Amino acid sequence: MTGMITDRSATTIIAQMLYLDAEDPAAPMTLRIDSPGGVATSTLAIYDAIQHVKAPVCTAVAGVAGGTAILIAVAGASGHRTATARSLYRFVRFRFRYRSEAAGRECDRLVDAFAAAIGRHTQLDRRAVARAMDREERMHALVALRRGFVDHVGGGDLLDGGR
């Protein structure tokens, strides 16, 4: 997964995951991440697919997991979330353009959904994640390891293997 997460890239990633899961639900699949994030709803669709497939999904960050891509990075199977030593996890404040109160509530719901999901997969609670998003915090791989965002940090060899 490289570049912005869009509706199109999410559809492609989800289709590949469902195909691999149908082929062999016991074989792990690896999702390599170097993305600044992107469309919130598309990211949530990928997250839902990761939670749905029976095959373990290993996540490997090489470069940046920014914005919404952080959720994909932390959603990998426990013990199988890796990052290269120079990887960066970069929170961003969600920016929405809305004109109605209902749209504003939906935006707040999306931010809360991201914060809660990231909190479930890390050592941070929902409020701490929301604060990190609001402050646009950055974490290098070793800090991400200490905070429970990743299970292993190392060199490029962490990116080998998987389907």
Language model regions located:
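Terminal-region recognition feature
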Residues: M1-R163
